[in-house]
Amino acid sequence: EAALHLEKGLNQALVDLHALGSARADPHLCDFLENHFLDEEVKLIKKMGDHLTNLRRLSGPQAGLGEYLFERLTLKHD
């Protein structure tokens, strides 16, 4: 959860920087941020959120088994 929170904070900082670039009419900065950072951040945040949701679903009486299956079936494919 902490890692997801950090990624969301980083994404917000990049969005703020993009807004500043737009306000200052700097298309090169905006293009650079869009192509190299913003799209990837959104994908990463989505993936982390999905993994976190799956881990929450797997927690329960047999949390150890759920975590094992999560690692085996999900993280090995990334």
Swiss-Prot record:
Q: Which family does it belong to?
A: Belongs to the ferritin family.
Task: Please report the organism this UniProt entry assigns to the protein.
Answer: Sus scrofa
Do you know which SUPFAM superfamilies this protein is assigned to? Ferritin-like
Question: Subunit details for this protein?
Answer: Oligomer of 24 subunits. There are two types of subunits: L (light) chain and H (heavy) chain. The major chain can be light or heavy, depending on the species and tissue type. The functional molecule forms a roughly spherical shell with a diameter of 12 nm and contains a central cavity into which the insoluble mineral iron core is deposited. Interacts with NCOA4.
| GO CC aspect terms | autolysosome; autophagosome; cytoplasmic vesicle; ferritin complex
| Function recorded in the entry | Stores iron in a soluble, non-toxic, readily available form. Important for iron homeostasis. Iron is taken up in the ferrous form and deposited as ferric hydroxides after oxidation. Also plays a role in delivery of iron to cells. Mediates iron uptake in capsule cells of the developing kidney. Delivery to lysosomes by the cargo receptor NCOA4 for autophagic degradation and release or iron.
User: Which domain of life, per UniProt?
Assistant: Eukaryota
Keywords from UniProt, A to Z, are: Cytoplasm, Cytoplasmic vesicle, Iron, Iron storage, Lysosome, Metal-binding
Cite the Ferritin-like diiron domain residue spans from the record: 1-59
Single Gene Ontology BP term? Answer: intracellular iron ion homeostasis
Please list the GO terms describing molecular function. ferric iron binding; iron ion binding
What is the recorded name of this protein? Ferritin light chain
Iron: present as a keyword of the record? yes
Q: Which InterPro entries match?
A: Ferritin (IPR001519), Ferritin-like (IPR012347), Ferritin-like_diiron (IPR009040), Ferritin-like_SF (IPR009078), Ferritin_CS (IPR014034), Ferritin_DPS_dom (IPR008331)
**What is the annotated localization of this protein?**
Cytoplasmic vesicle, Autophagosome; Cytoplasm; Autolysosome
- Pfam family of the protein (one): Ferritin
Determine if Iron is one of this entry's keywords. yes
